[in-house]
Amino acid sequence: MASTQLTRTATSGTNTKATFSAWVKKADANEQFLFYHFGSSANNFRIRFDPDTIGVQTLSSSSSVMHLNTSAKFRDPSAWYHIVVAIDSTQATDTNRAKIYVNGVQQTSLSATTYPPQNQNMHFNESATVYIGGQAGSNYFNG
């Protein structure tokens, strides 16, 4: 079981546009965080396996302003997955504000579909700790 993660402290920058990309291979079926930006318990951004779907969520003032979960299941322990999350909350159309791609295919069948409001601060580039492969000492990515 994994018990380590990478951390860095983000600096100020845009909080409305970003692209996250990772190649991952799961070793088990538990909930695991790929990326977690912990601005505070009230303001954070995360990308995770939940446990076999891919979820992306932003909390702002303790309310979920974005929550997307794929309907497709990703549970093959021998498969590599290329995951891309593209966010641009400045877009006029809500479904263009956040997109999840797996192995080059946009995931349009979603079990959770709360898109961010236009120009929403997504809390992913604030001066706070960014965790890659975990969530503040827990939910490590095991892969």
Question: Which role does the model predict for each range below?
Answer:
Residues 61-65, 90-96:
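Short, solvent-exposed loop/turn segments that connect beta-strands within catalytic domains
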